[in-house]
């Protein structure tokens, strides 16, 4: 069931049939709906990119070692789940990029979207290549540029949730989820984005493993 759910995400996104709270979305004007859709695409792309950035390494390691459950049956369930999570996220991300490209009507805007999406795809390729060939490879040089840029946009530098008490952190998380849900954004994207952002604010980029 989990595998089917992950692999169907791109199809559901194509037809815009995600579960969402659309009360305010329905009441919005055409221009308002355009902006709400734009925000949903951007938030979804960022969240899925960060998820894939870490999960693809876990999936590769799991496949290479043929990770198994360690039970009496000793099935390769962990390997299957990690692989399907990454594959499903990649197809989901691809469809969101296509939707964002189609969202614009001007050629300049479409070219900007293609450029940004190209940078994201290049980063994912570099992560895979560096993991397989090492930091000394050609892709390692490119990856170091991404890492250098990433050090300047670490959410933990602006909001360090470890310094907050659990009550305040919980209220912030719930408030952010409610605000995003009210925009009509798919609930799966909301929970993923808030989870990723919370992990970054708690532990930095190392928290993506969680």
Predicted regions and their residues:
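Alpha-helical transmembrane segments and membrane-interface helix-loop junctions
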Residues: 1-139, 207-210
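Alpha-helical transmembrane segments of multi-pass membrane transport proteins
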Residues: 117-210
């Amino acid at each position: 069931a989990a595998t089917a759910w992950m692999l169907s995400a791109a199809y559901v996104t194509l037809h815009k049939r995600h579960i969402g709270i659309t009360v305010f979305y329905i009441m919005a004007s055409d221009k308002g709906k355009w902006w709400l859709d734009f925000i949903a695409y951007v938030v979804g792309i960022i969240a899925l990119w960060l998820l894939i950035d870490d999960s693809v390494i876990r999936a590769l390691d799991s496949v290479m070692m043929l990770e198994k459950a360690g039970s009496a049956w000793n099935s390769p369930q962990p390997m299957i789940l990690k692989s399907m999570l990454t594959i499903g996220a990649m197809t989901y991300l691809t469809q969101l990029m296509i939707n964002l490209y189609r969202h614009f009507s001007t050629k300049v805007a479409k070219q900007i979207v293609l450029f940004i999406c190209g940078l994201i795809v290049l980063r994912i390729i570099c992560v895979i290549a560096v993991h397989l060939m090492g930091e000394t490879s050609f892709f390692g040089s490119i990856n170091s540029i991404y890492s250098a840029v990433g050090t300047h946009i670490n959410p933990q530098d602006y909001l360090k949730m470890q310094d907050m008490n659990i009550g305040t952190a919980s209220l912030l998380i719930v408030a952010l989820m409610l605000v995003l849900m009210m925009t009509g954004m798919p609930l799966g994207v909301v929970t993923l984005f808030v989870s990723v952002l919370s992990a970054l604010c708690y532990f930095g980029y190392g928290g993506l493993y969680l």
